[in-house]
Amino acid sequence: MAFHPIDLDSFPRREHYLSFIGNNQCSYSMTVNVDITALGAHKLYPAMIWLLTRTVNEIPEFRMALVDGVLGVYDDMHPAYTVFNKESKTFSGIWTEFDPNYSAFLAAYERDSALYSAAVSYAPKPNTPPNSFNVSMMPWATFTAVNLNLYNGGTALLPIFTMGKAFFADG
């Protein structure tokens, strides 16, 4: 989980970074419909978490964060995701260490989900790594846009993914 500080003096996006982290603080949301046909019989939520994490780990800009006020890039990321407690109708945020081998990741995901899905606390699994990003799903709601704003002084740089109910499109 190495974090590599970025030298702002040689950073090609220095001017843009300083503008948006300073005077032009903003957030943005982007909605992308994803064709999941190829997932076939795979369980949707863990498969999507794995695919998102693999993608985040391939794109350095998705691994950028501020640590103690220093801009840098993590070597790798792990998903922090929600599990729903059907009895209390609440969710908990847990995390699973990413494994590039889908079968190994799925086994770890299933262990963590089974262990923490009955929890009523917000974050029942301890030691969420700092190199994690958020994923959630509302499988009961079909939507084509969502907007999430964090009020933290504009320093949240890591991506947040929210998925909805799968739907058929274009035939």
Language model segments and positions:
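A short, aromatic/hydrophobic, helix- or strand-capping loop or linear motif
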Residues: 59-68, 118-122
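Helical lid/core segments from catalytic subdomains that handle acyl or acyl-like groups
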Residues: 85-143
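Flexible, Gly/Pro-enriched loop and linker segments at secondary-structure and domain junctions
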Residues: 1-32, 130-171
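Helix N-cap / beta->alpha transition motif
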Residues: 33-37
